[in-house]
Amino acid sequence: MRGVSVLESSGDTGVGAACLDQDGKTPQFNPVFPATCPYVTAVGGTVDLAPEIAWSGSSGGFSNYFKAPWYQKAAVQHYLNTYVSAETKEYYGQYVNFTGRGFPDVAALSVHPE
């Protein structure tokens, strides 16, 4: 480690940048690299101040290539078990790798910061 921090936008195309896998035929959310890399701090976007909410153009989700790092597993599992219904997980399971590295790591005001 060199002590260099790498921060990267989580993406500006919504949840998955595209809905086709690399073969161009299989429907699958396709999150953008390098935000999905566990060695990068992915920064998502928010909008409004009272209350501050996620910006719909920002991206987030789970990597199709990188497994969830050890420090995310408990928090992601808690989120999925508490806030995502079994029906939702079953339906979206064909499009999302729920065991992949979750992103973004942090979020900041992105739309009309004044």
Feature map (PLM): residue ranges:
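Extracellular protease catalytic domains of secreted zymogens
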Residues: 1-114
